[in-house]
Amino acid sequence: MQGRSSAWLVKHELVHRSLGFDYQGVETLQIKPEDWYSIAVISYVYGYNYLRSQCAYDVAPGGLLASVYHLTRIQYGVDQPEEVCIKVFVPRSNPRIPSVFWIWKSADFQERESYDMLGISYDNHPRMKRILMPESWIGWPLRKDYIAPNFYELQDAY
């Protein structure tokens, strides 16, 4: 079954893949990394003016990484806003996705956290650096193939 967003993208000949609907009825779409920025701009113009959340996850050990965007159309007088979930899959060998910071400013910390935890680099992000881990940290802690260091630094609480 095709949702409104997928039908709109098909009508305008924009490449995507429908992944169905989640348990709340939110349509989920898969977009290629090279198409993501243009589809993000088009989505904003179409009315998806609010980036509810951005997250990322490791699909499988040694497999793909995914960056997930939850977009919402906020309109005056609408009780149930239209939502869409967009997933962008990238290979772990070169995980690069265009940043949407310049479209939705709320992507700032969220993309940085995805970089910090999974190593997905967001091209054209103004401050693409670690946000939670120290800059000297080696590796990406939320990857399924991450090997945790066997040391723990204890700090004096006083």
Swiss-Prot record:
InterPro entries: NADH_DH_suC, NADH_quin_OxRdtase_su_C/D-like, NADH_UbQ_OxRdtase_30kDa_su, NADH_UbQ_OxRdtase_CS
Membrane topology: Peripheral membrane protein
Catalytic activity, EC: 7.1.1.-
Keywords assigned by UniProt, alphabetized: Chloroplast, Membrane, NAD, NADP, Plastid, Plastoquinone, Quinone, Thylakoid, Translocase, Transport
Protein's UniProt keywords contain Protein biosynthesis: no
Cell compartment(s), UniProt: Plastid, Chloroplast thylakoid membrane
Keyword Iron set for record: no
Reaction(s) this enzyme catalyzes, per UniProt: a plastoquinone + NADH + (n+1) H(+)(in) = a plastoquinol + NAD(+) + n H(+)(out); a plastoquinone + NADPH + (n+1) H(+)(in) = a plastoquinol + NADP(+) + n H(+)(out)
A Gene Ontology biological process term: photosynthesis, light reaction
GO molecular-function terms, A-Z: NADH dehydrogenase (ubiquinone) activity; quinone binding
Superkingdom classification of source: Eukaryota
GO cellular component, one term: chloroplast thylakoid membrane
Principal cellular location given in the protein's record: plastid
Assembly notes: NDH is composed of at least 16 different subunits, 5 of which are encoded in the nucleus.
Family to which this protein belongs: Belongs to the complex I 30 kDa subunit family.
Function: NDH shuttles electrons from NAD(P)H:plastoquinone, via FMN and iron-sulfur (Fe-S) centers, to quinones in the photosynthetic chain and possibly in a chloroplast respiratory chain. The immediate electron acceptor for the enzyme in this species is believed to be plastoquinone. Couples the redox reaction to proton translocation, and thus conserves the redox energy in a proton gradient.
NCBIfam families xref list: PRK12494.1 (NF009141)
Protein name: NAD(P)H-quinone oxidoreductase subunit J, chloroplastic
